Amino acid sequence: MTTALLPTGFRDRLPPFADAAARLEAAALAAAYAYGYERADPALAEFEAGLAGRLKAARAQDAVRFVDPVSQATLAIRPDMTAQIGRIAATRMGHHPRPVRLSYAGPVLKLRASQLAPEREL
C-alpha cells in the first residue's frame, strides 16, 4: 500500500521547474519595479472576518480556516492576494501619494479544487 506524501492538489516543485518559476517571478517583479511598482508581501494568514469581508463571496468560501492557538480567533489562509494588497494600500499605506502602485507574488491556498483547476496550492 502506498501512502501519499502530499494532500490532493499539492506538489513539490523540483529542479529545474522550481528554478524556472523563481526566475519568471523575479523577471515579472523586476519589470513591475521598472514601471514604478513597489513590492509588498502580505501575511500568509490573517483574521478570517477581515479577510472574508474583502473577498468576493466565491473566494471567501475558498479560504482555509483554522483557530489561532494564541488569540483563539479564527484565521484564514489567503485564497487570493488581491484583497490583502487592497487592505495594505488603504490602511498601512494610506499616507502614500495616489495611485499606490504595488506588485506582489507569493503562494495562495484554496480549500477546494475544481476539475478545471485541480491545484490547491498556487
Give residue spans per PLM region.
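TRNA-recognition modules of translation machinery and tRNA-sensing kinases, especially anticodon-binding
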Residues: M1-L122
